[in-house]
Amino acid sequence: MSETGSIADGYAAADIRAAEAPLLAAGAQLMRVAAAGLARVCRAEAPSGPVLVLVGAGNNGGDALLAAADLARDGRDVRVIRTASRIHGAAARAAEAGVPITPAEELDDAEVAALARASALVVDGILGIGTTASPALRGEARRVVAALLPVILGAGGPVVVACDIPSGVGCDDGQVPDPTVLSADVTVTFGAGKPGLMRGPGRALAGRVELVDVGLDLSGATPVARAAR
């Protein structure tokens, strides 16, 4: 396991992507390791009850889909809402594990809210650090999160676990250009801390941050943020 960074160190998204590249080229199972760590935290935060997983089109959604498959194999009732027009290839693993995947456009706001009310846990796997434009949610992703927010913020709402970074939070600056963001109870981040979890509004929205070591070598990179000690 890599010891090149700790949760106290926040590295720029570009540096993290550069550190991932050689591992991906060598066929390293980064996503598998990340998903196992995400599933482990989900089990700890909500040991029983249904799980609702929100996924986008990128690798963040892939991590969440593999974690959904792991939880379904535990015997959990897991459902996925696809918030983008495309879905990561890991959807096949989730489907093999018996996880139903529903396109967001097939659910109205009341149905989205009902799924959240029936869930013990919501996993936010919509956007990750690969987002290069504004992190603000758009389209169906924004609509789904807006429908969930009253349930999440209400009494007795489900636990929210964010995958790598809460969707809608800027990875490097922690800024939130649109308040339509699910505030996480726990953020499971991969490889190294993200500055956006330590700065600006993103710090409060991240909740407790758990680091999953995926073996990144960041020895040549300089941290750009440090968590408060």
Curated annotation (Swiss-Prot):
Residue ranges constituting the YjeF N-terminal domain according to the UniProt record: 11-222
Gene Ontology terms, MF aspect: metal ion binding; NAD(P)HX epimerase activity; nucleotide binding
Binding-site list for K(+): 60, 124, 167
Cofactor requirements of the protein: K(+)
EC number: 5.1.99.6
Cofactor notes: Binds 1 potassium ion per subunit.
Keywords of this entry: Isomerase, Metal-binding, NAD, NADP, Nucleotide-binding, Potassium
Positions annotated to bind (6S)-NADPHX: 59-63, 128-136, 164
Catalytic activity: (6R)-NADHX = (6S)-NADHX; (6R)-NADPHX = (6S)-NADPHX
Family under the similarity heading: Belongs to the NnrE/AIBP family.
Function: Catalyzes the epimerization of the S- and R-forms of NAD(P)HX, a damaged form of NAD(P)H that is a result of enzymatic or heat-dependent hydration. This is a prerequisite for the S-specific NAD(P)H-hydrate dehydratase to allow the repair of both epimers of NAD(P)HX.
Listed HAMAP family: NADHX_epimerase
Name of protein: NAD(P)H-hydrate epimerase
Organism: Clavibacter sepedonicus
Gene it is expressed from: nnrE
